[in-house]
């Protein structure tokens, strides 16, 4: 643990700490991710993860589910956010991934203004700050900036787009493409 690492650093033997790679949890071509079950978010680890991220669990519970999945023979669980094609965006403290098919998620309230988010945790953060359990305005979640072309028909129907994208190169390029 931490105390052992400090002790070894003080003794000058830190280079003798054995390297133990973390097991990979990302899907491989020979072991695709399979959804095993979906239900209400109940696991204490997932509720704790939401709280660590500053997300109101009631907000997450309105839009997300607890998804149990397998990669090969190993079983896992995560917070799942469903996309318009029936796939899931999956997050927990150890994993960020998705099931197929990969797509955007939209909430159509038939307005002339839309909100655009890069990822679903961005949407959950926004809703937590607004004290709203679900979007009241038209909303699109890209679930990846690579999905922008899929969102363009939905976005084009709106006179105003409020974009909540990451302040990085991918977010800036996405904004330029709008």
State the predicted function of each range.
Residues 1-49, 169, 173:
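Non-catalytic accessory segments of DNA primases and related replication-initiation nucleases
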């Amino acid at each position: 643990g931490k105390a052992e690492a400090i002790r070894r650093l003080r003794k000058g033997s830190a280079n003798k700490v054995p390297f133990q790679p973390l097991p990979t949890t990302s899907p491989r071509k020979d072991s695709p991710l399979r959804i095993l079950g979906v239900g209400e978010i109940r696991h204490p680890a997932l509720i704790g993860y939401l709280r660590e991220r500053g997300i109101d669990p009631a907000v997450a519970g309105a839009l997300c589910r607890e998804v149990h999945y397998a990669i090969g023979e190993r079983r896992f669980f995560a917070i799942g956010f469903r996309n318009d094609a029936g796939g899931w965006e999956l997050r927990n403290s150890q994993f960020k991934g998705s099931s197929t098919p990969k797509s955007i998620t939209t909430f159509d309230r038939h307005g002339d203004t839309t909100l655009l988010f890069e990822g679903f945790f961005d949407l959950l953060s926004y809703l937590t700050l607004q004290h709203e359990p679900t979007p009241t305005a038209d909303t699109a979640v890209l679930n990846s900036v690579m999905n922008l072309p899929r969102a363009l028909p939905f976005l084009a129907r709106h006179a105003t787009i409020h974009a909540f994208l990451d302040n990085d190169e991918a977010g800036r390029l996405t904004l330029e493409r709008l």
